[in-house]
Amino acid sequence: MSHHRGLTVAAGLWPTFVVVDAQDRAALNTALLPLLLKTWEETSTGSEHYERVAHNIFAFENPAVLALKTIVLDLARRHYDLGDAFELEGHEIVSQDRQFIKTHVDSEEGDLTLQYFVRCPAGNAALAVNQFGNAAFVLVNPAQPAGSFRFPNEQHHEYPVLPRDGLLVMYRSYTPHYQCPYQGDAPMVQVVCNIKLKRVSH
């Protein structure tokens, strides 16, 4: 005679790991800003963020860019084993008044993505980082797409980060994200950095 024993398993699967790193990087931003604005003017082909000539700022032999590269890779290596077989690509994002970024993922460009904020709304610096507001950068739970139902005991779908000068956000590239509308006179400037590990062919 066989006996059947019941089994119940509950597992919180697939968490998303996010790092928010806010430091005083005023000197770096002062050096980066004119270079990024100049590059944007030379490569932008339209009013939308994606309308641009493809380029990689990390190919520039510029001291400020090299300093940013060091910061980005140091933070990434602090949390992930990158090894030596990877590529780092980055480009500037310049936002004008009322401009925003729609929900998307960066998994075609990288495995690990970092957003570095160079010039942000001045009022954001006095506010808490984890909240919505002017040009808030928002990460969306990849297991619960925007618009899906959330039970009261489930975590929120979204994690907002309020940009400020010198702030870095690091997340896996498959994580959906968007940016709320920016309000301001001077263009907002940030750099998106994608780290893509090289695949081993068998």
Where are these regions (language model features)?
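A short coil-to-beta-strand element that immediately follows conserved catalytic motifs
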Residues: 81-91
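Catalytic core of Fe(II)/2-oxoglutarate
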Residues: 150-202
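Hydrophobic residues positioned within well-ordered beta-strands of beta-sheet architectures
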Residues: 88-90, 112-114, 189-193
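Non-heme Fe(II)/2-oxoglutarate
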Residues: 1-82, 100
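Residue-level preference for beta-strand/loop junctions
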Residues: 84-86, 108-110, 187
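Catalytic core of non-heme Fe(II) oxygenases with the double-stranded beta-helix
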Residues: 91-170
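Solvent-exposed residues in well-ordered beta-strands and their adjoining turns
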Residues: 21, 117-119, 194-198
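Short, surface-exposed beta-strand/loop "edge" segments at domain boundaries and coil↔beta transitions
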Residues: 27-28, 146-148, 201-202
